[in-house]
Amino acid sequence: MRGLLAGLAIVLMLSSCQTDKEQKPSPTPSAYRGEVTLGSKSLTEQYLLMKMSALLLKDQGYKVNEMVFLDSPAIRSAMEAGIADLYWEYTTTARIFYHKQTPIFDPDIAYREVSRTDAGNKIIWLAKSSFNSSWALLMRKDISEQLHIYRISDLADYIRTQRTKMKFATNAEYLQREDGLDRLKEIYDFELPDDQVVAIESDLLSQTVKDGRVDVAVGMGSDPRIKKNGLIILQDDRKVFPPYEAVPVILEKTLEHYPDIRTTMESLTPYITNENMLDLMYQVDILQKDITKTSRDFLVKNKLLAP
């Protein structure tokens, strides 16, 4: 789901106390709280989550090291080995790939179960955000409004009643997944012949919808090109897609040593929403803004950091 890759990770250590040009002067000895290592997968959304977390913890007096890992197995292994203290994980990633369990489609139950399982691994899941980096059905906003299609149920009703041959695009992975296109058609009760489905590269999905070459795409809800291309995400009202809600996870021993990290992280979590993350990724990926400045401006705007 998250583009997991096998093998050894390529890890880049970023010592924020040395490389962050925007950092304040090092905290005085009396303000110094300790040293923690934050991790990130190699994704823009993860860079943003790590950077915002690092800025807040540095503001609280921590020396923060930032490490970027190639993929999910690498960062999980680093946490289990005690190399990384904290990073942001996704509920269904943990459920499927770490715990080797079938997906749970209710977000609250999924969060509860991965939290319970990882407690036995000495890994603590803090409060979850509402940012859901999962699959999504994408449609042009103007066509959605014209046809009054705002939910996947609306789309299914339209296909059934209008007998229309709408064309879908997705990537090869979704076509092959057990919980992929066949589940979508079953849960929402509509037919979609093979000749109405095309498989293309993930990076091209939103552009293909924008250009009108297809009517709908099944892509990632965290793609910043959704905003750029004037698309909307149809509401998944029957929960066909498993939740990939982003949650800060921390080693139990680190949290015991620095219990105030929970408060710091949970001050940020309510602001990690789909809308905010899409906007932040749009600024970084599309407008090419600096990720540290973008993160700091967001925290200042929401009064989590002083100007």
Q: What residue ranges belong to the model's regions?
A:
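C-terminal motif of bacterial Sec signal peptides marking the signal peptidase cleavage site
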Residues: M13-S16
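Bacterial signal peptide processing site
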Residues: Q18-K21
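Short, well-ordered beta-strand elements
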Residues: S30-E45, Y62-V68, R163-T170
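Short helix-initiation/N-cap motifs at beta->coil->alpha
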Residues: T44, Y62-S77, A172, D194-Q207
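Ligand-binding cleft/hinge of the Venus flytrap
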Residues: S53-Q60, R151-D194, R296-L304
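Ligand-binding "clamshell"
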Residues: Y98-L126, R213, R225-K239
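A conserved helix-loop-strand patch within extracytoplasmic ligand-binding domains
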Residues: I109-K167, E252, P270-N274
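Ligand-binding pocket segment of bilobal, Venus flytrap-like solute-binding proteins
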Residues: R163-D236
